[in-house]
């Protein structure tokens, strides 16, 4: 079986190792292999830091810049 594709029953049991979310359009994995939701995975890929938990909402959210990045 190809490990890149998780069956539906396994996907339902996944919990994001960063925000503890259980609902996402796509599951990703950290370098250590732990599952992360799409939002946390993309935030880390872009900012190289874990996504702050206060950003987690039950509804859609805006992506905030990483700490230390100023607006012009």
UniProtKB/Swiss-Prot annotation:
| Originating gene | elt-4
Q: What is the name listed in the Swiss-Prot or TrEMBL entry for this protein?
A: Probable transcription factor elt-4
Q: Can you list the GO cellular component terms from the UniProt entry?
A: nucleus
Q: What does this protein do?
A: Probable transcription factor. Plays a role in regulating heme-dependent expression of heme transporter hrg-1. Modulates lifespan in a daf-16-dependent manner.
What would be one Pfam family of this protein? Answer: GATA
Highest taxon of the lineage: Eukaryota
Q: Which UniProt keywords apply?
A: Metal-binding, Nucleus, Transcription, Transcription regulation, Zinc, Zinc-finger
Family annotation (PROSITE patterns): GATA_ZN_FINGER_1 (PS00344), GATA_ZN_FINGER_2 (PS50114)
Q: What happens when the gene is disrupted?
A: No phenotype detected and so may be dispensable. RNAi-mediated knockdown causes intestinal expression of heme transporter hrg-1 induced by heme to be reduced drastically in L3 stage larvae. Reduces expression of the daf-16 isoforms d and f.
Record GO terms (molecular function): DNA-binding transcription factor activity; double-stranded DNA binding; sequence-specific DNA binding; zinc ion binding
- Organism this protein belongs to: Caenorhabditis elegans
| Family annotation (PANTHER family) | BOX A-BINDING FACTOR-RELATED, TRANSCRIPTION FACTOR GATA FAMILY MEMBER
Asked if the record carries the keyword Translocase, the reply is no
Could you tell me which Gene3D superfamilies the record lists for this protein? Answer: Erythroid Transcription Factor GATA-1, subunit A (3.30.50.10)
> Which biological process, per GO, is one annotated for this protein?
positive regulation of transcription by RNA polymerase II
Q: In which compartments does the protein localize?
A: Nucleus
Outline the residue ranges of the record's GATA-type zinc fingers. 16-40
């Amino acid at each position: 079986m190809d490990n890149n594709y998780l069956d539906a029953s396994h996907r339902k049991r996944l919990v994001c190792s960063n925000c503890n979310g259980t609902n996402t359009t796509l599951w990703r994995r950290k370098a250590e292999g732990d599952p992360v939701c799409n939002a946390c995975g993309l935030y880390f890929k872009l900012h190289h830091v874990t996504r702050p938990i206060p950003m987690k909402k039950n509804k859609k959210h805006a992506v905030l810049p990483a700490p230390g990045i100023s607006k012009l």
